[in-house]
A protein has these predicted regions:
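N-terminal strand-loop-strand
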Residues: 213-239
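Catalytic cores of DNA base-excision repair glycosylases
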Residues: 4-194, 200-211
Length: 239
């Protein structure tokens, strides 16, 4: 069975019950993805429910005052996310006739939406063939295929992105992408992964070669040394 089929099978049996998965509405998926940036899942669920209660749809967010959005965002930090949400909501509401863009190319041109979020929205909501690439996906791909390219270098990112695209199934792109994210959070965790429960362990290069704890690889950062200089000034009759 192919890797993508195994992930879909696992997802069908083990997917997490998350509030934004009860809908395919791009507004809800967008809000959840932005909130979950730099935010733990438990905290993200709380803030998502609170945000949707206050701003249940695009119109309510677009027609609100920015100060109200920022007030609701308190505790999440990175306030540029909230400002970008408000800006993009107004743009879609006033300039796109409230119609959320469906394609990756349109989505990525919106303020605050990058490669990952554009791929997630287009695949989950509109079944567009796009691969997500986040920490979970980097980790899964690196371990399964034994890829030792540093995940935090731009050139390496292209390698992982190509592999992620090649692994896409023939359908159910959104479910597959969400399956990867869940699999990385529950099974192929950064620390203490559940390799004994992993249905891909027999195919996993890292597992077969005891490399699980060393993959994925991050580039070594040069330590910045602080240099101190002492100066001695001798004044000899103003000469």
């Amino acid at each position: 069975m192919k890797l993508n089929s195994l992930i879909l099978k696992w997802y069908d049996q083990n997917k997490r019950d998350l509030p934004w998965r009860k809908t395919k509405n791009p507004y809800n998926i967008w809000i959840s993805e932005i909130i979950l940036q730099q935010t733990r899942m438990e905290q993200g669920i709380y803030y998502y429910n609170r945000f949707i209660s206050k701003f249940p749809d695009l119109e309510s967010l677009a027609t609100s005052d920015e100060k109200d959005v920022l007030l609701l965002w308190q505790g999440l930090g990175y306030y540029s996310r909230a400002r970008n949400l408000h800006h993009t909501a107004k743009h879609i509401y006033y300039h796109l006739d409230s119609k959320f863009p469906e394609s990756y190319d349109e989505l990525i041109n919106l303020k605050g939406i990058g490669d990952y979020t554009a791929s997630a929205i287009s695949s989950i909501c509109f079944e567009k063939k796009h691969a997500v690439l986040d920490g979970n996906v980097f980790r899964i791909i690196s371990r399964i295929f034994g890829i030792k390219e540093p995940i935090d270098l731009n050139n390496s990112r292209k390698v992982f992105k190509k592999k992620a695209i090649d692994l896409l199934p023939k359908s159910r792109y959104g479910d597959y992408n969400q399956g990867l994210m869940d699999f990385g959070s529950i099974i192929c965790k950064p620390k203490n992964p559940l390799c004994s429960d992993c249905l891909i362990s027999k195919k996993c290069v890292a597992n077969k070669n005891q490399l699980v704890d060393s993959l994925p690889v991050k580039a070594k950062k040069n330590k910045i040394k602080t240099l101190y200089f002492e100066y001695l000034i001798v004044n000899n009759n103003n000469q």
